[in-house]
A protein has these predicted regions:
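P-loop (Walker A) phosphate-binding loop of NTP-binding proteins
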Residues: 34
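Short, small-residue-biased leader/transition segments that mark boundaries at the very start
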Residues: 1-4, 8-15
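Pre-Walker A adenine-sensing motif
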Residues: 16-22
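Short beta-strand-centered segment that lines the nucleotide-binding/catalytic pocket of NTP-utilizing
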Residues: 52-67
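Short phosphate-coordinating micro-motif centered on Lys-Gly-acidic
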Residues: 48, 83, 88, 94-150
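Conserved lysine of the Walker
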Residues: 39
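Hydrophobic anchor at the beta1->P-loop junction of P-loop NTPases
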Residues: 29-31
Length: 150
């Protein structure tokens, strides 16, 4: 990991562990922020907090990684490298996403209307040399998740 401070922060119960405990599929979580803001680190810690013991790799080149943890399927999607939202059709996201799935999406703005709507939007940013996450619930599912993590 490049930034141990971020890994420690995102591994605390105030962030990824807490969200993972409260996440109930189906759920779509958009991860927004600049390059290096901690989106992938958060996703790794989130997936491990669900109980996945293996290596969680960045989906930057393959676009999509799939994990099964605690009876939940987690799809981790990174759209940074796509040039056209139509490229998502080749991944068959709609076919993979079901009632037992949590979908984590980095760079969701690049997915256009082909992505499932977000339940929760996490905005990663730095303030006063500290990494922070702003949480916005955009559905009733997201509001319930945000309420359980408060």
């Amino acid at each position: 990991y490049r930034d141990h401070r971020a890994l420690l922060f995102f591994s605390t119960r105030r962030s990824s562990d807490l969200f993972a405990e409260c996440a109930a599929p189906p759920c779509v979580i958009w991860l927004q922020g600049d390059l290096g803001a901690g989106k992938t680190l958060f996703a790794r810690a989130f997936i491990h907090a669900l109980g996945y013991d293996g290596y969680v790799k960045s989906p930057s080149y393959g676009l999509l990684e799939t994990y099964r943890a605690g009876g939940i399927q987690v799809l981790h999607l990174d759209l940074y490298r796509i040039e056209d939202p139509e490229e998502l059709e080749f991944l068959a996201i709609r076919d993979l996403f079901d009632d037992a799935t949590v979908l984590l999406v980095e760079w969701p703005d690049r997915g256009g209307s082909l992505l499932p709507a977000a339940d929760l939007v996490l905005q990663f940013f730095e303030q006063d040399e500290t990494r922070r996450i702003r949480c916005e619930a955009v559905s009733s599912t997201g509001a319930a998740l945000a309420a359980r993590t408060a």
